[in-house]
């Protein structure tokens, strides 16, 4: 039994709060099962004071979205000198900004789709690029605010310029890549197995596909050629290293194999705070590699540090 005191950060105040509560609760329960002394911290604006009073040995970061995975909480933990899991300040901030992460990935030789970044308020009656394309908020997760513009749409969707839009003014317009969706986790300096994600009843891997029971089917190991499987693993590890991630990350890909030849493999984005319930993608990959959920979390706790 470990004598370490682990504070699990969960909840928070981003749009991904429900996801974080699920991840954090699952992690806290599993870590208690591994013998750690666990305190659950539902994060508010007083989190620094709460942690100063608790003085845990390690913080397990189960937050998602802005504040939790954009370098903000990581900076607080560095200042408090409390070791923590997942990526550090710079990598977290960089990965949270889809446009900047794409620049770094492209510079590292990772294939990406063409994209432009713009202010949503300048989204007029003309398409910013030839459809089909995807509109993504630059700094959101869980597919919040993602809009697919199809080939036959004569005008851009009005929802993007609507006053009801809640996902920030900076958006990225990216060429739509047809085909299959794959994802690959990285644990330290090792790429885990590749999973194919098959949305059930949805056009793409949206919020419901990710979090509603039966919303998607996960196939691991992915049924794809050995060459493409290995290439996905290589690119996931390369993205993890280029962006400077630590601990665990997950990269998402699209693979269009409809034409002649091997097909087009495109890196979409990296997630430095992937979902952490037993049925989430990365824990499934760890299980495929022979690690129980609790063992996987134990590795993350023992890997925790400052100056990440």
UniProtKB/Swiss-Prot annotation:
InterPro entries, A to Z: ATP-grasp, ATP_grasp_subdomain_1, D-Ala_lig_Van_CS, D_ala_D_ala, Dala_Dala_lig_C, Dala_Dala_lig_N, PreATP-grasp_dom_sf
The positions annotated for binding Mg(2+) 2 are 269, 271
**Any idea of its EC number?**
6.3.2.4
The enzyme's first-digit EC class, named in words, is ligase
Any single GO CC term annotated in Swiss-Prot or TrEMBL for this entry: cytoplasm
Residues that hold ATP according to the record:
128-183
| GO molecular function list | ATP binding; D-alanine-D-alanine ligase activity; metal ion binding
Q: Which cofactor does it need?
A: Mg(2+); Mn(2+)
Recorded catalytic activity of this chain's protein: 2 D-alanine + ATP = D-alanyl-D-alanine + ADP + phosphate + H(+)
Positions annotated to bind Mg(2+) 1: 252, 269
- One BP annotation, GO: cell wall organization
Question: Which compartments is it annotated to reside in?
Answer: Cytoplasm
| Main localisation | cytoplasm
Its pathway, per UniProt, is: Cell wall biogenesis; peptidoglycan biosynthesis
Which is a Pfam family this sequence falls into? Dala_Dala_lig_C
**Keywords assigned:** ATP-binding, Cell shape, Cell wall biogenesis/degradation, Cytoplasm, Ligase, Magnesium, Manganese, Metal-binding, Nucleotide-binding, Peptidoglycan synthesis
> Could you tell me what the cofactor note in this record states?
Binds 2 magnesium or manganese ions per subunit.
* PROSITE patterns xrefs: ATP_GRASP, DALA_DALA_LIGASE_1, DALA_DALA_LIGASE_2
Please list the residue ranges annotated as the ATP-grasp domain.
102-302
Q: Which family does it belong to?
A: Belongs to the D-alanine--D-alanine ligase family.
Function noted in UniProt: Cell wall formation.
This protein is called D-alanine--D-alanine ligase
């Amino acid at each position: 039994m470990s004598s370490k005191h682990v504070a699990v950060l969960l909840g928070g105040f981003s749009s991904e709060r429900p996801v974080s509560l699920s991840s954090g609760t699952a992690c806290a329960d599993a870590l208690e099962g591994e013998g750690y002394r666990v305190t659950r911290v539902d994060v508010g604006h007083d989190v620094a004071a709460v942690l100063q009073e608790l003085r845990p040995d390690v913080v397990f970061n189960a937050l998602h979205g802005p504040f939790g995975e954009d370098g903000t909480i990581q900076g607080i933990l560095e200042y408090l000198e409390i070791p923590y899991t997942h990526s550090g300040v710079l990598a977290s901030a960089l990965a949270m900004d889809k446009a900047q992460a794409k620049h770094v990935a492209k510079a590292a030789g990772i294939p990406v789709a063409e994209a432009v970044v713009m202010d949503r308020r300048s989204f007029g009656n003309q398409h910013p690029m030839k459809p089909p394309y995807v509109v993504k908020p630059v700094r959101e997760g869980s597919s919040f605010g993602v809009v697919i513009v199809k080939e036959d749409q004569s005008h851009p969707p009005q929802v993007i310029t609507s006053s009801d839009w809640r996902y920030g003014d900076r958006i990225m317009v990216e060429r739509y890549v047809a085909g299959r969706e794959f994802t690959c986790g990285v644990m330290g300096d090792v790429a885990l197995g590749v999973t194919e994600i098959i949305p059930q009843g949805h056009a793409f891997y949206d919020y419901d596909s990710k979090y509603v029971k039966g919303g998607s089917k996960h196939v691991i190991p992915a049924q794809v050629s050995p060459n493409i499987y290995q290439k996905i693993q290589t690119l996931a590890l390369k993205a993890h290293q280029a962006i400077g991630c630590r601990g665990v990350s997950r990269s998402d890909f699209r693979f269009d194999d409809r034409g002649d030849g091997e097909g087009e493999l495109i890196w979409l984005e990296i997630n430095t705070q992937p979902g952490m319930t037993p049925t989430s993608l990365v824990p499934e990959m760890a299980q495929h590699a022979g690690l129980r959920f609790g063992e996987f979390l134990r590795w993350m706790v023992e890997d925790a540090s400052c100056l990440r």
